[in-house]
C-alpha cells in the first residue's frame, strides 16, 4: 500500500497547510467536505455524522460534510463556537480539468476566510447590532484603537492609551480584535467577548499602513481624511491588511476613516456598563437591558445607531442640543412622527446591502433593498419638506437626488426578486429585448414552432407540412414524398434545404429553423447569462453611487432614531433635559425606564423620586441609607441612566432634569466572584472601587452601593468611610453613595456638600411597608430581619435572629457587655482562650548595670567607656 496521498487529497493538504488556524471547507460538487482533524472538530461542533474516506499513512481518513446550499447556517454555528473557516471553491468545471488529462484534479483555491469580525451575510449577522472588527496598535509611546464594520462600512480610529483599551472595547463590543504577536491581550479580549487574532509585526508597520490605506481608498494621500498619528495609521493598516487576507482581494466598501477624540464621549468602563445593563442584561440576553426598554426604532440602521448613542453618550453640547431639538420638534408634530415611522418601517437595510454587493456576495434582493430604501427616502424627504431643524434638514437633503438610480432599478427589477442571481427571474419584462426574446423562446418554444409551421404551410401551399424533432436531426420540416418535386424545385429549394429522404417522407430545414433550434436549446442558459450580465451592470450602477447611497442610509437611521425618541417621549411622558457645562445634577420626579416598563406590564405604578447634587464647585454627594428592598439600588441606577439618555440626545424619564455634562460615569453596584482569576466578591468590589477613586474627575458621576459589605463589619465601615472622604476631598465629583453603615451619616455634619437621604418605610402592625420614596434624612434601621422573613426563612430562624438583634442593640445602648457574652454563646464567634501569662523573667546583668546608672552624673568619656563595658557584658552572657 502506498503512503502517497491521492492527487485530490494532496491538493487538500496543500490548501490546508496554507491556511493554518482555520477549518477548511473544501468544495466537492454540492458539498463542502472536511477531512482529518477538521472533520473531527466540525462533526462535534455541528453535531453531524463523522464518516471515513480512503486512507492516509495506513490510517482511515475522517470526513464530514455540509451541503453548499445550507452552508451559511453551519458557518454561523462554527463562528459562534470560536472557529475560523477557510472556504475553498472549485475554480473550474470538471470538464475543463479533464482537458489537462484524465487524472487532473479540479483546480481549487480559498476565496474567503470567514472570521467573527468579517461577516457580511444577512443570515450570519444580527440586523440590529454592529459587527465590529477592532485593531490595537502601539508605536513607541503612542497607542491607538481602530474599528470597522465591513457590513456597513463604518470605519473609525482614536488614540487609546493601554489603560483605556478595556473600557473602549467594552464600548464597541467588537467580535474580533487584531493585535501584534506577543501583545498579551488575551485577557482583555476575553473580557470584551472578542476573538483575539494575532498578526505579524509587519501588519502594524505604519509606513506600509499608509500605502495599504491609500490603495483601499484609491487616493494618493490620506491628508484629505485628516491627520493621523503613527499608531493610528498602524491600527488602521492592520485592518486593511487583514481584510485583504480574509477577503482574498474582494475588498469591502469601507467609508473613509473618521478620527474620534479620546474625550469626545462620556467614559463608561466595562464594570459600569455591566452593572447598569446598558445593552445586555446580567442574565446575558437583550431583554431587561436599557436598550431593550427604549428601542422603538423601526429600521435596522436606526437600532444600530441607538446602540452606539447609548454606548457612547456625547460630551459635545452643540451636538446634544441639536439632537434634542429634533426630538422636541417631532414630539410637537405627532402626525408627522407617525407618518415618518410608517414610511421608515418599509425601508430595508441599505448599508448591508451595499456591502454585500461590493464583496460580490449580494443578490437581486440587495438591489431591491436599495430601490426600496431610496424610494422610501424620497417620500420621507418630501414629508419633511423645508424643515428648519438642522438634524432633520441635513438628513432630508441626503435623501434626495437619487431619482435616476431609483428609476433604473424600478425599470429593471421585478417587484419581488428571488434571493440568488444564478436562479434568474429577477429582471422585469420589457427591460431588455434580447432577454425578452430569449425568455419567449424558452417559455413558448412550442408556440413559436407552431407559428413558424403555419408560415411555412402558407408559403409552400403544402397543407401536410410538419415541423418535427428527433435526437439525430434536431428540428426539421417534413412533407410526404408526393410533394418532393415541388419542394426540391425553384424557388422553394433556395429556402428549404434538403436533409433526408425516406420511403414515404422527405425532410428539410431552413436557416431560420436552424437558428431557432439553437436559440431554443440555448434559451435557458442564455436567459440566465443575460440576467447575470444585467445584475452586474445594475450592481455597478449602485456601487458607482455608493457614497450618496450610504449617506441616504445613514440619514434614514438618524431620522428613525429621532422619531423613535419622540415616540418614546410622547408615549411615556418623558421630558427634554437641560444639559449644560455646569456641575448641576437636578432630577425632579425621576424614574427607572427598565423597572417602570416591567411594572407597567404588571399594572403597577413606579414611584418617582427627586435627586439634587448641585453644590456649585464643591463636591455634591448624597449618602443614602435605608432598608433592604426599599429601592436604593434602583434609585442609584435610574439617575445614572438618566444622565446617559440626556447626553445620547434623547428625552428622559422625569418631570424636570438639569444635568451638567458628565465626563465619566462610574457604577459600583452589585458584584460577583471572578473565579477564573481567583478573585472573591470582595476583591472584585475593591478593584472596581479602586478604579473609580483613581480615575474620576470633578465632572464625573459616581454611584456606589454597599461599599465594604464583603468583609468584617468594622473593616467594611472603615473602608466605606475612607472612600467617602476620598471622593469628597480628592475626586470632588457628584456621587450617590448607598450604605447600611448608619455611623457614616455623621459625615454630613463635617463634610460640606454631603447630604443624608433615606428611602422611607412604614411599620404597620409588625409589617414593613416599603414606600420607595427617597427623602432627606438618615435611616435608623435596616429592617434586615423583616426582609429575611419576607424572603421565606423558617420562622424559627427569623425569631432567633430577632432575639439576637434585640440583645445586640440593648447591649450596645447600655454598654453592659452583653453582646460579648451573647457572641460567646455562638460557636462561630466564640473567641479562642487567651494563653496563660508567662512567669516574670530574671533581670540580666546588663539590665542591672543600666539601672545602677544616673545619666546626669557621667561624662562623655565615662559614657563611651560604659558602652564598651556593656558590650563586654553582652558577649559574656550565656
From Swiss-Prot:
SUPFAM superfamilies: DNA repair protein MutS, domain I, DNA repair protein MutS, domain II, DNA repair protein MutS, domain III, P-loop containing nucleoside triphosphate hydrolases
GO cellular component: cytosol
Keyword Transcription regulation listed: no
Top-level taxon: Bacteria
GO molecular-function terms, A-Z: ATP binding; ATP-dependent DNA damage sensor activity; damaged DNA binding; mismatched DNA binding
NCBIfam families, per database record: mutS1, PRK05399.1
Protein name: DNA mismatch repair protein MutS
Amino acid at each position: 500500500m502506498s503512503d502517497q496521498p491521492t492527487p485530490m487529497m494532496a491538493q487538500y493538504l496543500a490548501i490546508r497547510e496554507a491556511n493554518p488556524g482555520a477549518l477548511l471547507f473544501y468544495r466537492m460538487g454540492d458539498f463542502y467536505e472536511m477531512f482529518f482533524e477538521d472533520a473531527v472538530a466540525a462533526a462535534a461542533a455541528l453535531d453531524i455524522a463523522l464518516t471515513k474516506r480512503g486512507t492516509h499513512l495506513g490510517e482511515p481518513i475522517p470526513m464530514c460534510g455540509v451541503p453548499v446550499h445550507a452552508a451559511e447556517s453551519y458557518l454561523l454555528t462554527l463562528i459562534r463556537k470560536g472557529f475560523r473557516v477557510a472556504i475553498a471553491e472549485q475554480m473550474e468545471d470538471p470538464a475543463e480539468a479533464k482537458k489537462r488529462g484524465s487524472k487532473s484534479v479540479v483546480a481549487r483555491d480559498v476565496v474567503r476566510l470567514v472570521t467573527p469580525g468579517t461577516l457580511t451575510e444577512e443570515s450570519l449577522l444580527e440586523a440590529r447590532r454592529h459587527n465590529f472588527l477592532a485593531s490595537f496598535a502601539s508605536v513607541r509611546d503612542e497607542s491607538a484603537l481602530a474599528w470597522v464594520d465591513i457590513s456597513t462600512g463604518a470605519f473609525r480610529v482614536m488614540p487609546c492609551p493601554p489603560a483605556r483599551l478595556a473600557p473602549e472595547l467594552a464600548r464597541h463590543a467588537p467580535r474580533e480584535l487584531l493585535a501584534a504577536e506577543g501583545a498579551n491581550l488575551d485577557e482583555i479580549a476575553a473580557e470584551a467577548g472578542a476573538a483575539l487574532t494575532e498578526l505579524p509585526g509587519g501588519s502594524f508597520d505604519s509606513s506600509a499602513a499608509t500605502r495599504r490605506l491609500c490603495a483601499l481608498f484609491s487616493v494618493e494621500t490620506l491628508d484629505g481624511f485628516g491627520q493621523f498619528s503613527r499608531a493610528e495609521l498602524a491600527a488602521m493598516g492592520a485592518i486593511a491588511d487583514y481584510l485583504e487576507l480574509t477577503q482574498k482581494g474582494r475588498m469591502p466598501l469601507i467609508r473613509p476613516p473618521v478620527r474620534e477624540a479620546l474625550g469626545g464621549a462620556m467614559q463608561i468602563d466595562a464594570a459600569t456598563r455591566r452593572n447598569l445593563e446598558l445593552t445586555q442584561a446580567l442574565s446575558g440576553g437583550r431583554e431587561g437591558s436599557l436598550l431593550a426598554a427604549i428601542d422603538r426604532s423601526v429600521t435596522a440602521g436606526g437600532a444600530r445607531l441607538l446602540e452606539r448613542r447609548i454606548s457612547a453618550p456625547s460630551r459635545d453640547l452643540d451636538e446634544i442640543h441639536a439632537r434634542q431639538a429634533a426630538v422636541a420638534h417631532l414630539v410637537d408634530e405627532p402626525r408627522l412622527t407617525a407618518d415618518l415611522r410608517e414610511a421608515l418601517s418599509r425601508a430595508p437595510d441599505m448599508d448591508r446591502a451595499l456591502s454585500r454587493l461590493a464583496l460580490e456576495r449580494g443578490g437581486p434582493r440587495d438591489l431591491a433593498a436599495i430601490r426600496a430604501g431610496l424610494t422610501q427616502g424620497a417620500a420621507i424627504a418630501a414629508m419633511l419638506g423645508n424643515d428648519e431643524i438642522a438634524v432633520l434638514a441635513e438628513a432630508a437633503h441626503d435623501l434626495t437626488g437619487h431619482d435616476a438610480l431609483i428609476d433604473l432599478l424600478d425599470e429593471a427589477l421585478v417587484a419581488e426578486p428571488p434571493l440568488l442571481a444564478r436562479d434568474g427571474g429577477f429582471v422585469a419584462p420589457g427591460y431588455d429585448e434580447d432577454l425578452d426574446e430569449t425568455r419567449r423562446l424558452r417559455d413558448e418554444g412550442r408556440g413559436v414552432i407552431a407559428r413558424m409551421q403555419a408560415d411555412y404551410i402558407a408559403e409552400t401551399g403544402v397543407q401536410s407540412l410538419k415541423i418535427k424533432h428527433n435526437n439525430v436531426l434536431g428540428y426539421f420540416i417534413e412533407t410526404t414524398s408526393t410533394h418532393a418535386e415541388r419542394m426540391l424545385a425553384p424557388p422553394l429549394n433556395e429556402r428549404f434545404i434538403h436533409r433526408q429522404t425516406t420511403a414515404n417522407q422527405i425532410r428539410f430545414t431552413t436557416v431560420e429553423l436552424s437558428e431557432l433550434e439553437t436559440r431554443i436549446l440555448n434559451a435557458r442558459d442564455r436567459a440566465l447569462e443575460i440576467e447575470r450580465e444585467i445584475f452586474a451592470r445594475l450592481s455597478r450602477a449602485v456601487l458607482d453611487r455608493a457614497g450618496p447611497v450610504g449617506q441616504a442610509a445613514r440619514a434614514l437611521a438618524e431620522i428613525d432614531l429621532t422619531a423613535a425618541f419622540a415616540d418614546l417621549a410622547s408615549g411615556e411622558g418623558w421630558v427634554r433635559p437641560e444639559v449644560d457645562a455646569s456641575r448641576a445634577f437636578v432630577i425632579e420626579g425621576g424614574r427607572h425606564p427598565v423597572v417602570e416598563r416591567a411594572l407597567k406590564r404588571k399594572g403597577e405604578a413606579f414611584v418617582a423620586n427627586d435627586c439634587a447634587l448641585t453644590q456649585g464647585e464643591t463636591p455634591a454627594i448624597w449618602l443614602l441609607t435605608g432598608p433592604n428592598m426599599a429601592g436604593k439600588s434602583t434609585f442609584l441606577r435610574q439617575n445614572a441612566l438618566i444622565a446617559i439618555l440626556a447626553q445620547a440626545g434623547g428625552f428622559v424619564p422625569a418631570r424636570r432634569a438639569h444635568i451638567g455634562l458628565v465626563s465619566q460615569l462610574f457604577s459600583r453596584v452589585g458584584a460577583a466572584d471572578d473565579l477564573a482569576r481567583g478573585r472573591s466578591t470582595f476583591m472584585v468590589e475593591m478593584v472596581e472601587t479602586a478604579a473609580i477613586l483613581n480615575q474620576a474627575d470633578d465632572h464625573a458621576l459616581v454611584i456606589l452601593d454597599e461599599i465594604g459589605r464583603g468583609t468584617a463589619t468594622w473593616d467594611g465601615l472603615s473602608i466605606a468611610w475612607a472612600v467617602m472622604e476620598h471622593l469628597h476631598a480628592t475626586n470632588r465629583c457628584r456621587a450617590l453613595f448607598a450604605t447600611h453603615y448608619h455611623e457614616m451619616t455623621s459625615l454630613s455634619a463635617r463634610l460640606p456638600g454631603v447630604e443624608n437621604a433615606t428611602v422611607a418605610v412604614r411599620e404597620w402592625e409588625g409589617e414593613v411597608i416599603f414606600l420607595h420614596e427617597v427623602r432627606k434624612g438618615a435611616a435608623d434601621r435596616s429592617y434586615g430581619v423583616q426582609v429575611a422573613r419576607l424572603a421565606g426563612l423558617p420562622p424559627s430562624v427569623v425569631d432567633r435572629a430577632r432575639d439576637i438583634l434585640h440583645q445586640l442593640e440593648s447591649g450596645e445602648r447600655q454598654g453592659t457587655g452583653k453582646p460579648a457574652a451573647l457572641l460567646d454563646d455562638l460557636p462561630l464567634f466564640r473567641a479562642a482562650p487567651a494563653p496563660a501569662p508567662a512567669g516574670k523573667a530574671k533581670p540580666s546583668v546588663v539590665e542591672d548595670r543600666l539601672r545602677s546608672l544616673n545619666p546626669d552624673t557621667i561624662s562623655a568619656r565615662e559614657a563611651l567607656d560604659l558602652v564598651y563595658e556593656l558590650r563586654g557584658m553582652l558577649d559574656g552572657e550565656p
